[in-house]
Amino acid sequence: MKKLLITIGLLIACQWLAAQNLPLIKPIDDYSFAHFERNHLLYPGDSTAMERFFQKLDSVVFLGEGNVNIMHIGGSHVQAGVFTQQFRDNLLNIGTDLIGGQNFVFPFSAGGTNNPSHFMVSSTGGWGYTRNAVRKDTDKRMGLAGAAITTTDPKATVSIMSRARRPNLLTPEFNFNKVTLIGFSETENVEPVVSYKGKTLHGHYDDYQSTYTFEFPDFTDSICIFFESMPGDFTLQGVLLENGMSGISVHGVGVNGASVPSYLRCDDFERDLNLIHPDLIIFGIGINDAAEANFEKETFKRNYDDLIRIIHRVNPDCALLFMSNNDSYKRVKGKKKRVRYEVNTNGSIVEQACLEMGKKYNAAVWDQLERRGPFTAWSGKNSRSSRRISS
């Protein structure tokens, strides 16, 4: 099915192309209810940070020099990876040989939940799963991924393949020759190892970063993580795949049900963020915050203040882009405690908060509520309307 609207990846690409006086690279379908004339990045404050980001993008695209790291952070829509993968595909096709040197991933399916779409995972043995959106889980240390898997099973393995489940003609292929496993053993006696072409490799351990780094003589698209012995436990917090090449890297960080406070509960978020040192962060967190019965704009903004403070400690020059919420539904309890769904009117409050934060932090804003209109306008225009989801 054709996309209802261009993705933010194409939006960024088009804005960048406009600055180069180049034509659009992808046609846009015409829908009467969509406000295409409003489909652009807003700058309520100063645009200097984004201009600096675009200059760095110029160096990568035109000179083949340097790296650009972009992180898209959110909830279930980012964990699913569909939006982020389309963003990645569009952005990496504005030129040639642009696929960057890093790919931060987390093997969600080993914990019994869904993986993003741009890589594949298989696992064996028993793994316990914790995520930042569940308060009772936050006694387990989590990092940038917002999730963790833990095992005491000597037969436990996790295999990761850096290939999209449903690739299209634009989907780039990512190969790597370096792997960094982020994790720890609470019993301090379990070490993860990696299988590479039939050989067992031991990594270099960094106690400060809590990482195990493995380097390969050749490029590959897959690894298997396992344990030679299991006298205790091991918790995996994330995996960084690298190839040392210049280009554009797009990292998706998303957990089902996550809100801004969910990421603030991750003790090792800042530590792990240093590994990718983002140049641009796209904030897609807000749907789950706005679904809370006691949602307040000022609290929402203060939570973002805390998160941005962490980000700017890692990279003070990191550009920020806020995505406002779509129209959405929220669960409410009616008579006799029956659950029903109603339109969440907090979307417009999140929209205003994004504009205010855009001004405060000199950030860009992509106003989805403004450009696509209310749910009643686009409902029934695509095959997902029965689920109240726009494509």
Specify the residue positions occupied by each region the protein language model found:
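Conserved SGNH/GDSL esterase-like catalytic core that processes O-acyl groups on lipids
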Residues: 79-195, 204-302
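Active-site-proximal beta-strand/loop segments in catalytic clefts of secreted hydrolases
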Residues: 73-76, 252-257, 283-288, 323-327, ...
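Loop/turn elements at helix/coil->beta-strand transitions in domains of secreted/extracellular proteins
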Residues: 66-69, 246-249, 276-281, 315-320, ...
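Alpha-helical scaffolding within the catalytic cores
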Residues: 45-60, 263-275, 302-310, 349-352, ...
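Sec-dependent signal peptide cleavage junction
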Residues: 18-59
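Catalytic His-Asp segment of secreted/periplasmic serine-dependent ester chemistry enzymes
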Residues: 267, 328-391
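Bacterial Sec-dependent N-terminal signal peptides
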Residues: 1-28
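Conserved, well-ordered alpha-helix/loop/beta-strand core segments that scaffold catalytic motifs
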Residues: 280-286, 304-312, 319-324
